[in-house]
Amino acid sequence: MSTFSASDFNSERYSSSRPSYPSDFYKMIDEYHDGERKLLVDVGCGPGTATLQMAQELKPFEQIIGSDLSATMIKTAEVIKEGSPDTYKNVSFKISSSDDFKFLGADSVDKQKIDMITAVECAHWFDFEKFQRSAYANLRKDGTIAIWGYADPIFPDYPEFDDLMIEVPYGKQGLGPYWEQPGRSRLRNMLKDSHLDPELFHDIQVSYFCAEDVRDKVKLHQHTKKPLLIRKQVTLMEFADYVRTWSAYHQWKQDPKNKDKEDVADWFIKESLRRRPELSTNTKIEVVWNTFYKLGKRV
């Protein structure tokens, strides 16, 4: 994804402003995974958000490798890792595409040497069929493939902000024209059109979660599979910083015709405060995301 590879993309803000993933979700992955834990590869790892979390949250793997096409992202991941060298001593990072495992070396690539492959908040940018076939070629028998992501958050306690959460990312006066397609549309659809091939993987599990369900306890408890529930307490200022991590925001800022326009993220804050004047830029409020996950085991 070209924007995240740009030298002027703020990967540090991306790392600090993006949500992390709950411990109970990693516990579910632990329970799903069978067999050895020698090597985990996290493709499309960005600044290592999930890669470094997995090093702490999952039962130990001997080696964890995060890979990403963006040298900018990998540099940030390595800086974060170097801040806690003992915690992440089994973690390394490589510049590579999601379907290229040559960094494993000639003796290991396409030789079913990987125990788990993860793709977190990135698979919407992939050639999905090419990726899953490459994963199949590199996973050992019964090795785990785990794909998950999130999009389109809401503030559950402030339904009057719902239209803002559409206008800012998708409105014509907002960031709508600046998303790279078809990737964003795939993510917005929670990758529902991308399926793990049952000829390549078995014990396939898929879950979709709509953030609005947190407003309805009945719907929340009707999920047959435990959903990936990503929620976070943020200030309006912090949420604006999150908006600034979006690839579309970066493209919007690069467009000369927006030079004299009010910043989209600043407009979001101003409009939110107009609607709820009792709030301030530093008031903590809850945000919840739509999410999905897809799990499978190599046949």
Curated annotation (Swiss-Prot):
InterPro entries with a match to the protein in the record: Diverse_substrate_MTase, Methyltranfer_dom, SAM-dependent_MTases_sf
Subcellular location: Cytoplasm
Keywords (A to Z) from UniProt: Acetylation, Cytoplasm, Methyltransferase, S-adenosyl-L-methionine, Transferase
EC number(s) recorded for this UniProt protein: 2.1.1.145
Gene Ontology CC: cytoplasm
Pfam family, one: Methyltransf_31
GO molecular function, one term: trans-aconitate 3-methyltransferase activity
Chemical reaction(s) catalysed: trans-aconitate + S-adenosyl-L-methionine = (E)-2-(methoxycarbonylmethyl)but-2-enedioate + S-adenosyl-L-homocysteine
GO BP field: methylation
N-acetylserine modified-residue sites: S2
Induction note: During amino acid starvation.
Entry function: Catalyzes the S-adenosylmethionine monomethyl esterification of trans-aconitate and 3-isopropylmalate at high affinity and of other molecules like cis-aconitate, isocitrate, and citrate at lower velocities and affinities. The function of trans-aconitate methylation appears to be in reducing the toxicity of this spontaneous breakdown product of cis-aconitate.
Family, as annotated: Belongs to the methyltransferase superfamily. Tam family.
PANTHER family xref list: METHYLTRANSF_11 DOMAIN-CONTAINING PROTEIN, METHYLTRANSFERASE TYPE 11 DOMAIN-CONTAINING PROTEIN
Protein name: Trans-aconitate 3-methyltransferase
Source species of the chain: Saccharomyces cerevisiae (strain YJM789) (Baker's yeast)
